[in-house]
Regions:
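Active-site His/acidic residue clusters
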Residues: 241-257
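Acidic/histidine-rich catalytic cores and adjacent linkers
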Residues: 304-305
Length: 493
């Protein structure tokens, strides 16, 4: 199979915001306890954080981490997680039928985020709480001192404010599964008033308002329009969430699911622009795709997990090589929309539908999906370019006619590099690929990294953590994308 990839330096999509390489840690399963935080672990540092996990997070290249939820946040009292640990209450976590010990809270999280070099993105509870609690949390985190909650923070040993810039106004508030779920009118009014107050406390804060939980919600579209009609002047981003799975075992269709993400982004962008015009606003609403991933492997086993325990093994998907190809396609799609998608969070980060897995008290390792994210975060910087691909296509079930090759090119003027990310979806044909970049002169190919495996169901485990591992190909004049492979091709100019 032949493929041609075209891009032009003079026609960028836009700058790639580093926050598109974000992730998510929720108080759910073993994400926090036994993942991020495990004081008795051999690698634990002075704060109880697992050093082996922090090294993997840094290697992954995560730039921002959303916290503490997720569904969890809609029943969370942030005050439970501050001050002396021995005084913190144990609470029922109704979102995940677990016990929350509150041994990790906002102060510990921001300390951990600083250690891994990621910006924190805090969510406030708009399920059981509202304006007052959000105001107080913002004051505790970001006000210098001389007030009740800023001085409370200082009394806890944190003299300087945390300076948390990014905040989520609740989570999936349209969902019937959500604690304190709301109609679009109810949520829109509450989110608008909360946003006003939070920005009065800290004018530098940047706020994300909840979009629909997914495109199958009966109010999808109407929800976005209604919520934005109340909040457009007060918030900076609208959230999108989407997960994909292969329950039917149809690999060809599964590999095309990024087409659904593409249409989702286009639809929500159009709704945002419609509200913008109706309000005669000069502000563009950006998107925060703050939950995206493959999620389906753990659905059945989660039904067997004992309820009302601390850190139960929930949502522990073990990812295949096939899943890594899908994650690669989803990353490419996000980058192709970098003019609107300014924040994105791979959900989640540790143990829970995550690229990083741990044994409580034991080993840690990188799952298959770790590597496409790591490559994009490391190499796809600067500007994304309008990228066109000419290649064969196939019928992908509900996603329709789908090109075999999915690709995006990025250019970084600061170091004069060009990166091409590409997935070959074909089951049996390599793609001999020609890349043409206009407006940049001659290109020199510097590197070709590939992630491939003969077994689509291959996984990495604690005992075999390198079964699916990227490798460098020998450089040659021809660029060949192997059948069912993830590729990173680096050029300089």
């Amino acid at each position: 199979m032949k493929a041609k990839i075209f891009a032009d330096r003079r026609f960028p999509v836009g700058p790639i915001d580093e926050k598109v390489y974000g992730s998510f840690v929720e108080h759910l399963g073993r994400a926090v306890y036994g993942g991020m935080y495990e004081p008795g672990h051999p690698s634990a540092d002075e704060d109880g954080f697992r050093a082996d996990v922090m090294e993997l997070v840094k290697k992954l290249g995560v730039t921002l981490v959303r916290y503490p939820g997720g569904n969890f946040v809609s029943g969370y009292n942030w005050e439970d997680g501050i001050g002396p640990r021995e005084l913190r209450p144990r609470r029922l976590d109704l979102a995940w039928s677990s016990i929350e010990t509150n041994q990790v809270g906002v102060a510990e999280f921001q300390k951990w985020a600083a250690k891994v070099g990621a910006a924190p993105m805090m969510a406030v509870n708009l399920g059981t709480r509202g304006v007052e609690a959000a105001r107080d949390l913002t004051e505790y985190c970001n006000f210098p001192g001389g007030t009740k909650f800023s001085d409370l923070r200082r009394s806890h040993g944190y003299e300087e404010p945390f300076g948390i810039k990014y905040w989520c106004l609740g989570n999936e508030m349209d969902g019937p599964w959500q604690i304190g779920g709301k109609t679009a009118e109810e949520y829109g009014r509450l989110a608008a008033e909360t946003a006003k107050v939070m920005k009065w406390v800290d004018p530098d804060s940047r706020l994300v308002v909840c979009g629909s939980s997914n495109t199958s919600m009966p109010t999808f579209g109407v929800w976005e329009e209604t919520v934005l009609s109340h909040t457009y002047d007060y918030v900076d981003y609208l959230s999108l969430h989407s997960y994909y799975g292969n329950r039917s075992g149809d690999t060809a269709e599964f590999l095309a699911c990024s087409r659904d993400m593409d249409e989702f982004i286009r639809t929500v962008s159009a709704i945002c622009d419609s509200v913008k015009q109706r309000k005669h606003s000069d502000r563009t609403m950006f998107l925060s795709f703050d939950e995206w991933n493959v999620w389906f492997h753990s659905n059945e086993q989660d039904k067997q997990v004992e309820k009302w325990t601390v850190a139960p093994p929930l949502l522990e998907d073990i990812y295949t090589f096939e899943d890594a190809l899908v994650v690669g396609c989803l990353l490419i799609t996000l980058l192709r929309h970098c003019d609107r998608v300014k924040i994105a969070c791979l959900a989640q980060l540790i143990n829970v539908i995550a690229p990083i897995m741990t044994e409580t008290g034991g080993r840690s390792w990188a799952q298959t999906i770790f590597y496409p994210f790591m490559h994009a975060a490391a190499f796809a910087r600067g500007d994304a370019l309008n990228t066109r691909v000419e290649c064969g296509s196939y019928s992908a079930g509900r996603y329709g006619d789908t090109p075999y090759v999915e690709s995006v090119a990025t250019i970084n003027e600061s170091d004069r590099t060009v990166t091409v990310l590409a997935v070959n979806r074909s089951a049996d044909e390599d793609a001999e690929t020609e890349f043409t970049l206009g407006g940049a002169g001659a290109l020199t190919k510097e590197r070709h990294i590939v992630l491939e495996n003969a077994d689509l169901k291959a996984v990495n485990t604690a005992d075999d953590p390198e079964r699916v591992l990227p490798r460098d190909l020998p450089l040659s004049e021809k660029t060949v994308l192997g059948a069912r492979s993830w590729n990173v091709i680096r050029y300089c100019y």
